[in-house]
Amino acid sequence: SGDLGAERYAKMCKSCHGADGSNAAMSRALKGLPAEEVKAALIGYKEQTYGGKKKGMMERVVKSLTDEDIEVLATHIGTF
């Protein structure tokens, strides 16, 4: 699933967050965040229960993610 997570990250996240998650994008860097925290944030964005003033971008990005997508992305990002 690591490869799938890397593919999803490259397609959906890298342009704003950087190859290794170190770009702050509109909020903060992803590098160093535990997978569980990333997963909770992605679910929160999808359910529109998480995020600050600029959450609209992330809500648009995650709305099409499946539970599996969220799991593999969180696991991949947790390795940064």
Curated annotation (Swiss-Prot):
The keyword Transferase does not apply. Coiled coil: none annotated. Heme c binds at residues 13, 16-17, 58. One of its GO terms (cellular component) is periplasmic space. Binds 1 heme c group covalently per subunit. One of its GO terms (molecular function) is metal ion binding. It is found in: Periplasm. Its main location: periplasm. It comes from the Bacteria. Keywords: Electron transport, Heme, Iron, Metal-binding, Periplasm, Transport. Natural electron acceptor for a formate dehydrogenase. This is Cytochrome c-553. It comes from Desulfomicrobium norvegicum (strain DSM 1741 / NCIMB 8310) (Desulfovibrio baculatus (strain Norway 4)).
